[in-house]
């Protein structure tokens, strides 16, 4: 898989933004990607050094519209910690 296919989008929440000073960044990633692929993709796309990767599968939630019931899609979340000597990811710096 290409790095652009692995990293889908950044997760911008209050909790994820509070982890940026510790050099932890949160992304939605492809469900088939493993930690090694995620690490390589972040290093290639952003030019940083990754120390550790945590992943979690987010289960779908039930949603109703009137009498019809459906589900949101299941997705995979990755939290990436950069090394101390690594530079920060510029995209997130503009959000703080």
UniProtKB/Swiss-Prot annotation:
The keyword Transcription regulation does not apply. GO terms for biological process: translation. GO terms for molecular function: rRNA binding; structural constituent of ribosome. Part of the 50S ribosomal subunit. Contacts protein L29, and trigger factor when it is bound to the ribosome. The gene is rplW. NCBIfam families: PRK05738.2-4 (NF004363). Keywords: Ribonucleoprotein, Ribosomal protein, RNA-binding, rRNA-binding. One of its GO terms (cellular component) is ribosome. One of the early assembly proteins it binds 23S rRNA. One of the proteins that surrounds the polypeptide exit tunnel on the outside of the ribosome. Forms the main docking site for trigger factor binding to the ribosome. Belongs to the universal ribosomal protein uL23 family. Pfam families: Ribosomal_L23. This is Large ribosomal subunit protein uL23. It comes from the Bacteria.
